[in-house]
Amino acid sequence: SLPWQHASVTGGRWSGNDTPRVFELRGKTLGIVGLGSIGKKVARLAQAFGMTVTYYDIRRLSEDREDALGVRFRLLDEMFEAADVVTLHVPLNESTHHLINADRLARMQASSILVNTSRGPVVDETALTEALTARRLFAAGLDVFNDEPPAPDNALFALDNVVLTPHLAGPTYESHEARIRNGFDNVQRVARGEAPLWVIPELG
């Protein structure tokens, strides 16, 4: 909603009294695809906003661990049918390429939102564009694309129910410094004959 409202103000139109185009996170269900380190952090943040958190991962946690994190496992298709917001946090490989396809998008509620900050080809971009265009999906937030940078004529650019950013969801001043430190630490580990940490899955 922020980009829309910003454009409204700078365009000379005051839309403060319009019918709201947003919903609260409190009481909604979040579906996390990929409960790695990032997925777990997202779960904690979502719980702070009062969301119910479900997840799908190829390796299910123990029930004790699920209880500690406050999350519940769901099969992927079940999650897509029930979640108000689905967020993706998986690496790109043969099993995740187009994991989110036309069939799974069709399972989502028309009021739901898809967020992808993992890798572009995890989502069938053509199928997503069609779902958004037909309003079978309320909105999407994409930080990644099938081709980066996307072509100027990408059909997503013409839609008003999608927010697009140039693969920068992670970088901050602090994270940039941490990446430099981690890279230096990895070089030292390898020089000592130890296994590196923070290996990129696609390159591992």
Per-region residue spans from a language model:
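Short, flexible hinge/linker loops that cap or flank conserved catalytic cores
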Residues: 22-26, 47, 106-107, 156
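C-terminal helix-to-coil terminal segments
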Residues: 5-8, 15-16, 21, 147-204
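Glycine-rich NAD(P)-binding loop of Rossmann-like domains
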Residues: 5-41
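Residues at the starts of beta-strands that form the adenosine-phosphate
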Residues: 48-52
